[in-house]
């Protein structure tokens, strides 16, 4: 198998891994609020838009490195009244949890691939 074929195969595997387990939801307290019922619900559905991979010259843990570009549909609301937002509108800790889930899933199945995420 040529290096290009290996990269194409990894591209397909990354897409399958991310796109298969691609939903998250939860709620967060509104900033600067001390009321226990002042919160927002959120839900996110994401899919891979593009994968950019290359073989690492010298590697200890990562044989392949790259970036995964993600399209994310973000909905924020309260009691079922949803509005569409972008990933940057979520609190940073929620975005971090989403990134961690995606990266953990990739690392679990492809430990020799080290990628970062970019949300479109």
Protein language model features and the residues they cover:
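Negatively charged, low-complexity tracts enriched in Asp/Glu with abundant Ser/Thr
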Residues: 2-41
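Detector for Asparagine
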Residues: 19-22, 97, 105, 120
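Short acidic DE-rich linear segments
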Residues: 113-120
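Acidic, low-complexity, intrinsically disordered interaction modules
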Residues: 27-112
């Amino acid at each position: 198998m040529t290096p290009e074929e290996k990269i194409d195969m990894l591209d397909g595997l990354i897409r399958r891994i991310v796109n298969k387990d691609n939903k998250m939801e939860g709620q967060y307290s509104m900033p600067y609020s001390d009321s226990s019922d002042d919160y927002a619900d959120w839900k996110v559905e994401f899919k891979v838009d593009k994968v950019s991979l290359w073989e690492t010259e010298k590697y200890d843990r990562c044989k392949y490195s790259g970036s995964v570009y993600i399209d994310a549909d973000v909905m924020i609301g309260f009691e079922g009244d949803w509005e569409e937002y972008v990933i940057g509108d979520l609190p940073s800790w929620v975005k971090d949890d989403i990134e961690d889930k995606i990266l953990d899933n990739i690392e679990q199945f492809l430990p020799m691939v080290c990628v970062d995420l970019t949300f479109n």
